[in-house]
Amino acid sequence: MFYSFCKVGQYMTYFKFELIHRSKKSRARVGRIHTPHGIIDTPNFVAVGTNGTVKALNNTMLHDIGLQLMFCNTYHMMLQPGTDIVRQAGGLHSFIQRKLPIITDSGGFQVFSLAYGSVADELKSRGTKKQGGCVLKITEEGVLFRSYRDGSKVLLTPESSIKAQKDLGADIIIPFDELPPYHIARDALKKSLDRTHRWEKRSLEAHLKNPQEQAMYAVVHGGIDPDLRKESCAILTELPFDGFAVGGSMGKTKDEMHTLLSLTLPLLPEDKPNHLLGIGDLPSIERSVPLGIDTFDSSYPTRAARHGILLTKQGPLNITKSEYATNFNSIEKGCLCPACHHFSLAYIHHLFKARELTCMSLATVHNLYFMVQLMEKYRKQIQEDLI
Amino acid sequence: MFYSFCKVGQYMTYFKFELIHRSKKSRARVGRIHTPHGIIDTPNFVAVGTNGTVKALNNTMLHDIGLQLMFCNTYHMMLQPGTDIVRQAGGLHSFIQRKLPIITDSGGFQVFSLAYGSVADELKSRGTKKQGGCVLKITEEGVLFRSYRDGSKVLLTPESSIKAQKDLGADIIIPFDELPPYHIARDALKKSLDRTHRWEKRSLEAHLKNPQEQAMYAVVHGGIDPDLRKESCAILTELPFDGFAVGGSMGKTKDEMHTLLSLTLPLLPEDKPNHLLGIGDLPSIERSVPLGIDTFDSSYPTRAARHGILLTKQGPLNITKSEYATNFNSIEKGCLCPACHHFSLAYIHHLFKARELTCMSLATVHNLYFMVQLMEKYRKQIQEDLI
């Protein structure tokens, strides 16, 4: 069992990573992340609850299906309701009534992706400035942007991001970083990376002044440049972070991502947990678990659910197809989720056709339970050295 | 205890109305309606689940809060998924997985309200033909209308409505009736009433050929004309219906409705349950319980919930108001609903502001639980002769 450092020589008791098994077949590993709000078995899937709820569910439902880690977005919580209010409520766990672990990001990703658009937007030339939010100025200090909610100017810096994340009080927090656009010259990428490292260091320093029983994961950047990725690992692993997230652009294809992760993961310390930011579609998880990724967050299963895509062991099915109108079986035989336990494909198909909100929660709870089960299966297979 | 007749001399064992207490102070009464899917304590509120679900909830949640009767709309179920499919699923209870009693209407109300608009639409001159559905022809046979879903022509007759309701298999069904517009000359109203009586009789005959453990409530019509209301009661109470619903236009104001109900209720048999169709706002319930109404259906509490109106003992509150942003109490102190048990006003306010679907289900489950509790309070007060 490895204990993470808070400061040199000072053992943390509230956060540790326990390595249970390392596969003989790959770099895949099974572990346990101990947090103030309980254990996260790894590898695991992290549900995205941007505004403090997974869309269409409530947090007691998440608890009941055993979803161990939930991702909330600091950017959104800053703008609504404001992190002050969450602090007054006693922190995010109390405000949203979640008893299990939470991770928050720095807000940087959202600010920059609103400015540049997502990588996918960029590749598809869908333009920028979604939702009307925009970056006004990037300086060494931080980023000045306009709130998409009320048009007010907001300055986000490493210190203000950490202040916000202290208000939120998640178990795992993320330093402030820059998300450079996918199409960027190497010089500009290098400059961005250097600044990100300075911002992450400032974030860590701000955090360590008041650890508040939170753990901080660094975010490895460097885009699709292998040398810069290596440099990022080298610099960040020198700092007393509690874990390491992999962020930034990872290329256009799953092959590119696989290559980058294969290069990056071995450069991260084995005794600390790692996280793959914003990627959690099924093929990516399948290819990344053998590389040693511990946790994945993604809105894929929940967003897919709201569009009628239900995950099953036989692959995703589109519940809106007419073939399900008279299928009175459950989504997946043997599935113990509340949707499968009570309702048929035909009924859920009907709810989608009738545009009833109820279908969203049934589909979402099924897909998340599927992810919980899938990750449990991966852990079992790793322990049996099958992965 | 009164037993309803199925045919003369043939006692029904699957449906009966049990009168528990008649108030000494008013015509209010406490009773129990026994159905194949359990008891409905009266007076009670009936939740509207148009498409086989209360919007934003699932049927296990309804069960858990003790909602004893749910109203599904035959018109909607005919067009989507089609009552054939529901029959194949084993009926509505099986299809939507509801273990407690269900009532369905005839489809007539929707067909005509799509043609004429609702009374409220009419009074506000909002015009007709909402959603693009329209009545093509009304004959003695029935109504030919165009489906708002696919533009196909559908003929709804007393016999086809009952056929559909046999497919659905609710505990309580409603004969096919005409909903005349509010602004109608007396002659036309009288003609409509006569036809409605013929249609209701045909519906009853169709039903009694195959009772299928269903009970049928007549629908008293006559609009705002006291003499026609009396005539309707006289004619319908001669027929072996199992209960009596009051339908049609009941005037522009609550006073008009009160006058009409005061006149109508004493003309209905005491040994059978009655129902007030489509009216269940709080002031109307408060004024109608003393008149002896047993059940009320209304989409008010659920629709209000989706607009952020939460019902409390101190009156409705608008959760979207900024005063709730930092109110960390539950919606109502002591309320045992899932929303109050877990979440604060501030969090639900936040979910509304962030436009999260989750707020809809929390608000809806609270409002319905409020109605369950309210009706229980009324029953208690009647038993103590306070109403």
Curated annotation (Swiss-Prot), chains A, B:
Q: Which UniProt keywords apply?
A: Glycosyltransferase, Metal-binding, Queuosine biosynthesis, Transferase, tRNA processing, Zinc
Residues binding substrate: D105, S106, G107, G108, F109, D177, G248
* Requisite cofactors: Zn(2+)
Single annotated GO MF:
metal ion binding
Positions of the UniProt region annotated as RNA binding: 278-284, 302-306
Residues binding Zn(2+) are C335, C337, C340, H366
Give the pathway annotation: tRNA modification; tRNA-queuosine biosynthesis
Could you name the active-site residues? D105, D297
Q: What's a Pfam family this protein contains? A: TGT
Gene Ontology biological process: queuosine biosynthetic process; tRNA-guanine transglycosylation
Q: Which reaction does it catalyse?
A: 7-aminomethyl-7-carbaguanine + guanosine(34) in tRNA = 7-aminomethyl-7-carbaguanosine(34) in tRNA + guanine
Cofactor detail note: Binds 1 zinc ion per subunit.
InterPro entries cross-referenced by the UniProt entry: TGT, TGT-like_sf, tRNA_ribo_trans-like
- Name the Enzyme Commission number(s) assigned to this protein: 2.4.2.29
| Coiled-coil boundaries | none
Per the entry, what this protein does is:
Catalyzes the base-exchange of a guanine (G) residue with the queuine precursor 7-aminomethyl-7-deazaguanine (PreQ1) at position 34 (anticodon wobble position) in tRNAs with GU(N) anticodons (tRNA-Asp, -Asn, -His and -Tyr). Catalysis occurs through a double-displacement mechanism. The nucleophile active site attacks the C1' of nucleotide 34 to detach the guanine base from the RNA, forming a covalent enzyme-RNA intermediate. The proton acceptor active site deprotonates the incoming PreQ1, allowing a nucleophilic attack on the C1' of the ribose to form the product.
Oligomeric form and interacting partners? Homodimer. Within each dimer, one monomer is responsible for RNA recognition and catalysis, while the other monomer binds to the replacement base PreQ1.
Family, per entry: Belongs to the queuine tRNA-ribosyltransferase family.
HAMAP family cross-referenced by the UniProt entry: Q_tRNA_Tgt (MF_00168)
Q: What is this protein called?
A: Queuine tRNA-ribosyltransferase
